[in-house]
Amino acid sequence: NHTYDFGTDGNMDTRAALDVAGIDWGKDGKIVYKEINGFKIAFVFGSMYSAGAEQAMLVDLEEANANSDYQVVYFHGGEEKVHAYEDWKQASCHNLVDHGADLVIGSHPHVLQPMETYNGVNIVYSLGNFIFGGNNYPENRTLIYNQTLTVTQDATTGGFTVTNTGVTLIPCYVYTGESNNYQPAVIENETDKQLVI
């Protein structure tokens, strides 16, 4: 919802800069595919602000399932500054998993929200802020979510087997001051890490 803070020109400039840098970007209705040694990952994007809002993403997810081996859904939605996810958001995320999502990650609330595993699939309801210059009072906690996959290919069929071999959470502080160039910083103190996780 902030992609047009600087108007259409700002949005298009950002897309062009990402393209020049070779960084993939996504938006509602645009599936991004990445292929590594024949293994294809699809990234599906969408917005969810109320019950049933995942329906548009289900169309993209169906296409992604037909054209890739692993599907990541990244959604934007939910109530801001609330640490608990809403029942409707949980139901929508479960629906995405039921329709083939292999990982579901959320954003928008500006705060961390819980994670859960549903039918073997990890759902991260909100990663909070990461790089944020919108105001000087964001929640100062965020994390990097790192999911490790082991992929094996069947020599006879060529098909892939994917195993989730672990999740690493890297707690970070969010900084909004220009002196730090708005860059997040990894939390090194073990006690402080526990406050985030």
What are these regions (language model features)?
Residues 1-197:
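Acidic, metal/ion-coordinating pockets
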